[in-house]
Amino acid sequence: MSVPELDYITVKGFKSIASIEKLRLRSINVLIGPNGSGKSNFIGVFAFLHAIREGRLQDYVAKAGGADKILFFGSKETNEIYLRISFEDEVNQYAIHLAPTSADSLYVAREAVYYWDKLRYPEAPYDVPISSRNGEAGISDSKSKGITDWVRTRLGRWRLYHFHDTSSTSPMKKVADVADNRFLRSDASNLASFLYFLRERHENSYSLIRKAVQRVGPFFDDFILEPTQLNPDKIRLEWKHKRSDRFFDASSLSDGTLRFIALATLFLQPIILRPSVILVDEPELGLHPYAITMLGSLIKSAAQKTQVVVSTQSALLLDQFEPEDVLVADRIEDSTHLRRLESEPLKSWLEEYSLGQLWEKNQLGGRPAL
């Protein structure tokens, strides 16, 4: 596997997380835990950092309902949010302190990037303070240079995906712009245009996606991807049945099949188009058991070159991974705690049970507690 994009993260004072100190991240990070343990909040940290990088800190706070909703137990309990991430064995780092205002917003109290040449300066990295601007973090400045620009570029290469909406108004089922194909959007609203682009320019990846969908849905032959005749700037997701020449579009697919198509596209797209960090909250939702095992294989394959962070409630999906891939979330004293599993303490158990079975037997933690 390649070196993970991120190697450590520290989170303090964010939503249900009072303190997670220097958590090591691997190429694969599978979060398990009961409802309310804070798995989604941990993944939400990355969305928060992305918003900060994009210059949308104030917009994020407003949409969340104010700073009190983001701070751990509110501003009476927590006086700041502190986030710190490191890249490439801590050579480059980024940290930000956010404090509440009287107007129930957040302001940047301190922000810095770090560079650590451990051979020349073994004791500590040197820091470069960043100045905030117009209420937004300095890392959002597109004119930044040096280490700041390096970190800003890395923060822009993450993407958080939610493919939960497969209703009649799902973005995946709507007509998309043909030209909207630079990357797969977080809700797969441009799934048709992105697949069309892959078919035209990245045939090998398109073929892998098609074959993966055929394994989950044997009735599926191929996608029909052409700009609409009435408006050549638009395209919709259509497909061909192996035993019928009737018209089929995304609405003709089951919810699980449509989600799997989006997931297969995400994990099998060419490396040059893929985000450096892929984050997905409960990707197994609505999938058939066989599709869940396929999903595990897709994640492991993608993680050879891309860092993956997923949360799951599926014991079957958990079975596809090694103990060291797993982060267990528990709520201890009203705060989210994360710990990584290790193979050695589980060695005798794993001779008789799978990882998912051990989780169901409450041998791993991450289960509801009375």
Segments from the language model and where they lie:
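Conserved catalytic network of the ASCE P-loop NTPase/AAA+ motor domain
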Residues: 75-76, 89, 268-273, 300-304, ...
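Electropositive, glycine-dotted interaction segments
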Residues: 88-216, 221-224
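Short beta-strand segments that buttress and anchor functional surface loops
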Residues: 81-88, 239
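GG-anchored amphipathic helix commonly corresponding to the ABC/SMC/Rad50 NBD signature/C-loop
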Residues: 234-236, 241-245, 249-280, 290-293
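The Walker A (P-loop) glycine that initiates the GxxxxGKT/S ATP-binding motif of P-loop NTPases
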Residues: 33, 282, 313
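C-terminal lobe/lid and adjacent interdomain/linker elements of RecA-like ASCE P-loop ATPase modules
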Residues: 1-4, 293-370
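Pre-Walker A-like glycine/lysine-rich segment at the N-terminus of P-loop NTPase domains
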Residues: 1-80
